[in-house]
Amino acid sequence: MGWGNNYFRTPLYPRMGIQQTVFEKEAFHRFLTDYTGALNGCAGADKTWNRGALASEVRAFYSEQATEYGYTSLRDWQQVKKPLVNPLYSAVGVLGFMGPFFCESQLNTDLPEIEYPFTLAHEMAHLAGVTSEAEANYWAYVFCRQSKDAAVRYSGYLGLFVYAASNASALLQNDELVAWIETLSPVVLEDHRSIQEFWQGKRVKAIDNVQRWMMDRLLKSNHVTEGAHDYFGVIAMIMTMDAQIGTEI
C-alpha cells in the first residue's frame, strides 16, 4: 500500500524547477525529424541483449539517474515477475503491470522480443516510484536511447511510435503527414504492423473495453488527471526535457 503514496508526490516538472515547453508545430517538426532519423537508423538491428543482463542495466540506470529526481534506487532482488493469469493480460492488451499492494512489477510473457526492452524499462520505472504513465514512458525511452545496443535503442524508438504518430496526425496537415510516413523505413512500418496484428489477435473486445474503463477510472482517482490518455503525454515530456536539460541526463 505504501507505493500508492507516490501518486501524491510533487510532479516531475515542479520538482526539477522547469516549465513545460509550449507544444508548437515548429518544435514538433524538429522533434519528429530527429526522432524519425534515429528510428530509421537502428531499424532491423540484430538482437544482442539477454534478459538478465538487460534487467541489471535497467536497475543500474534508475539507481544512477532517476534517484537524482527523487526516485528510489532498485535492488538486485527486485525482478519483474510473470502474471498468474497471463492470457487475461493479453486479452486486454496489457503489456505490463505494477502491483501496488506488494510492490511488484509484472511483464506479459507474450511480449515480442522487439517490445521487451522498452516495456521492461517502463515497468521498472514504476518500481522506482514513477506513477505517471507518460513519465514511465519517458524514462523507458531515455534508458533505451542511451544504450550501446542498437536493438535496445530501436525498441525505445519503436515504443514511442504510436505516440509520435498520434501527435503527427493531430498537428500536421494531411500532405505533411503523408510526406512524413513516406520517410519511414519499410522495416519500421512492417514491425509496427506485425506488433499491432499480434496483439489484436489476442484481444477479447468485451474484456478489453472493461479494462480500459477501469484503468481510466483508477488513474483519475489517483491524481492522474489525464486518465488512460496520460501515456500520450510522453512526447511533450521528451521535448521539454531535451530542450531544458539536454538529451544526456
Question: Each PLM stretch: what is its role?
Answer:
Residues 3-66:
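Membrane-interface segments at or immediately adjacent to transmembrane helices
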Residues 19-22, 45-52, 106-110, 121-128, ...:
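Second-shell loop/turn segments in exported
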Residues 187-249:
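Pan-zinc metallopeptidase signature
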Residues 118-137, 141-142:
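Active-site recognition of the HExxH zinc-binding catalytic motif
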Residues 8, 12, 39, 43, ...:
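A generic secondary-structure signal for well-formed alpha-helical elements
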Residues 55, 109-117, 129-133, 150-154, ...:
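Solvent-exposed, acidic/flexible segments
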Residues 138-190:
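Active-site/pore-lining binding-face segments in mid-to-C-terminal subdomains
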Residues 41-109, 113:
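Auxiliary, metal-adjacent structural segments of Zn-dependent hydrolase domains
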